[in-house]
């Protein structure tokens, strides 16, 4: 049986560009397309309270394989292009979700 995973991503966005970056994600349907993927259980962005230039993302996938497939899809490639324009740093962490 595949182990579900939790992925957390923290983007440090160029000064004053956080809202524009998030709006581009929404306007391009990247968040909706990611949520619609088979194997996705959660894909939500958050504004952290400790930084005005960071944007956080929480993802839950049914398996590492499902998340890996996500990174090959066109909307992920759009996100990669947006990151090149808006993002200074990315911290990504992956956690296995234990069976209940």
Each model region followed by its residue ranges:
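Compositionally biased, intrinsically disordered low-complexity segments
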Residues: 28-29, 33, 63, 90, ...
């Amino acid at each position: 049986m595949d182990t579900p995973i939790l992925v957390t991503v923290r983007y440090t966005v160029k000064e004053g560009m956080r809202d524009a970056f998030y709006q581009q994600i929404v306007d391009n349907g990247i968040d909706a397309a990611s949520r619609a993927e088979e194997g996705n259980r959660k894909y939500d962005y958050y504004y952290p309270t400790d930084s005005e230039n960071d944007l956080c993302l929480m993802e839950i996938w049914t398996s590492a394989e499902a998340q890996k497939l996500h990174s090959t899809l066109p909307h992920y490639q759009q996100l990669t292009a947006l990151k090149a324009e808006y993002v200074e740093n990315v911290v990504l962490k992956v956690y296995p979700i234990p069976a209940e």
